[in-house]
């Protein structure tokens, strides 16, 4: 089931995003819903099924994209999946209060575990077979294949736990760098597997940097422990022939923004930002390199009124339309699964009225 034109729109989501990436004029500001669990709840699919059944997952995302006119390229998975890939234990969402899969046991429990850790066989690791099945379904539907290869600092945190990684940065920096080396090489291998399977056309690779926010680490530690590995990952994957990266720069990363200038994203890439970063500042640092996405506060979408979401979306659009390489409106992080439909629609209405 392909994503058709939203009623009254000249372009469909695939055409609109492709035009942005090619530097062409689009008919309206794009909508980047950043929606996972919301798609499940929106279509009556359980979160357990959504995160374990690629077909049900894709259908839920397509129906939701059709409903709201979502221009985001659809993706399978969840933020901490690399813990599963490296042999950790994941708990799938099974109760009404669960929002997403979570790690219940990290692969690395001790320093000894860290030094003994090995890169898993990429084709068989954890969630990879499910992700590959999802991308094969995307291929059948004529959609761009998407795969999140994380970002090394986030992936290392999901291998040993963020608290341990932060402690080892100070007390055992060699061990921290060892884990970062392993997950970087794993991400490159995962990208190579996708490229060998599908070729460089119609693939979107994704990275995300929530654990690199200044709410977690300083700019000094970002420069030492996060930036070099993220830069290497992007450089080596782009050298394989893929066109661009989509990167979510999550949380308060205002002090890190100058360093992101050194990261290649493609020409252009796509970069989304947490609500803690003003879009004007995001455009200042990356607007010449990336299509900018953002950044309505997720809390507001979950707990605010439609009028409040509408006004916040209007403010984002007015700032974002000044981006040199283009702009898409979206939440500042994943759309909360229990967001009221009226609040999500308010974002789309703001695009219709101001974008």
Language model features: what each stretch is:
Residues 42-83:
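Segments that shape or occlude catalytic/ligand-binding pockets
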Residues 53-55, 106-112, 125, 305:
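Intrinsic-disorder/low-complexity, polar/charged segments
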Residues 79-120:
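A contiguous, low-structure linker/loop signature
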């Amino acid at each position: 089931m392909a994503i058709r034109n939203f009623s009254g729109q000249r372009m469909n989501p695939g055409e609109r995003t492709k035009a942005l990436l090619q530097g062409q004029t689009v008919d309206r500001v794009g909508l980047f819903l950043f929606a996972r669990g919301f798609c499940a709840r929106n279509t009556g699919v359980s979160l357990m099924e959504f995160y374990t059944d690629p077909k049900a997952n894709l259908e839920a995302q397509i129906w939701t994209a059709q409903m709201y006119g979502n221009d985001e390229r659809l993706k399978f998975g969840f933020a901490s999946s690399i813990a599963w890939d490296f042999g950790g234990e994941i708990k799938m969402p099974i109760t009404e209060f669960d929002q997403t899969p979570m790690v219940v046991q990290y692969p690395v429990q001790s320093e000894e575990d860290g030094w003994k850790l090995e890169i898993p066989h990429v084709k068989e690791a954890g969630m990879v077979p499910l992700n590959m099945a999802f991308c094969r379904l995307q291929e059948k539907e004529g959609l761009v294949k998407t795969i999140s290869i994380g970002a090394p600092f986030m992936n290392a945190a999901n291998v040993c736990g963020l608290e341990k990684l932060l402690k080892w940065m100070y007390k055992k920096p060699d061990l921290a760098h060892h884990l970062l080396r392993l997950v970087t090489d794993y991400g490159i291998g995962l990208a190579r597997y996708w490229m060998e399977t599908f070729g460089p056309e119609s693939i979107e690779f994704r990275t995300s940097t929530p654990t690199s926010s200044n709410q977690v680490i300083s700019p000094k530690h970002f420069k030492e422990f996060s930036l070099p590995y993220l830069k290497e990952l992007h450089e080596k994957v782009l050298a394989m022939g893929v066109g661009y990266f989509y990167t979510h720069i999550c949380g308060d990363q205002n002090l890190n923004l100058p360093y992101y200038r050194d990261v290649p994203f493609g020409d252009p890439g796509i970069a989304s930002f947490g609500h803690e970063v003003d879009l004007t500042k995001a455009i200042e640092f990356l607007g010449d390199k990336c299509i900018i996405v953002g950044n309505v506060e997720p809390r507001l979408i979950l707990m605010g009124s439609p009028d409040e979401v509408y006004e916040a979306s209007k403010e984002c659009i007015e700032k974002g339309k000044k981006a040199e390489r283009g702009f898409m409106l979206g939440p500042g992080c994943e759309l909360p699964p229990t967001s009221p439909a009226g609040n999500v629609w308010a974002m789309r209405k703001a695009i219709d009225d101001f974008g």
